[in-house]
Amino acid sequence: MSSSSIPVLPLRDIVVFPGMVAPLFVGRKQSVNALNHSMNLDKKIFLLAQKNSETDNPNKSDLYECGTVAKVLQLLKLPDGTIKVLVEGTSRAQLMTLNTSNDFLSAKIKIVDTKFKNNNNLKALVKVVLEQFEDYAKVNKKIPSEVITNLSSMTDAYKIADVVSINLTINMQQKQEILGMFNLEERLNKIHLYLVSEIDSFQMEKKIKGRVKRQMEKTQKEQNQSPPETNPPRIFLEVHQQLNRTANHSLHF
């Protein structure tokens, strides 16, 4: 389904998913104009991540083709001319054409179909992803407990996939890869692989920290049990000998 033209907000170093609420700071003139235009219409804006965050005036080749249509929830104009905006992603969409001729970017987009076609394979995959995410939340303490609670009451596989993706501690490119997967089964499989990898990484980190802690405790215990030295440490003897040699040499002058 194609939509009419919609203002575009290029994003630096962040990917916004459907269902995600995100605060954004906007300072570029084009982006400020896009937000103002959005507020004058239906408060809808198309969020597209940039391939390179250092690009100031992106064109179509500088932006990823898959983004998220979002609704502006709050907008606050700051004294320095920048804008703090709170947005909520509503739907996944594909960039069709980009208009750069105005004082803000606008686009023709195609909303991605999210009708859940239920089958046994998808149901099993969703169950595996949910179980893996629960394990992930046990090792990653940054996951709020209410996320698990909310997931347990969800039945929409698309929403489940997006909520899990939002809470994965993977890089921007990896999140963009997931956002751009229109096939739900492929997306869930990719999420599952990232979950397994992240859990392994956290467990390995925990093992290393535990090993280092035990070694430090062992060293400290050995130091506490060692009898006090009655003779000067070897390093002091070596320094003393060096000083004596220096003194003997000085007698010849």
Language-model regions, residue ranges each:
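N-terminal low-complexity, acidic/polar interaction/targeting segments
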Residues: M1-F253
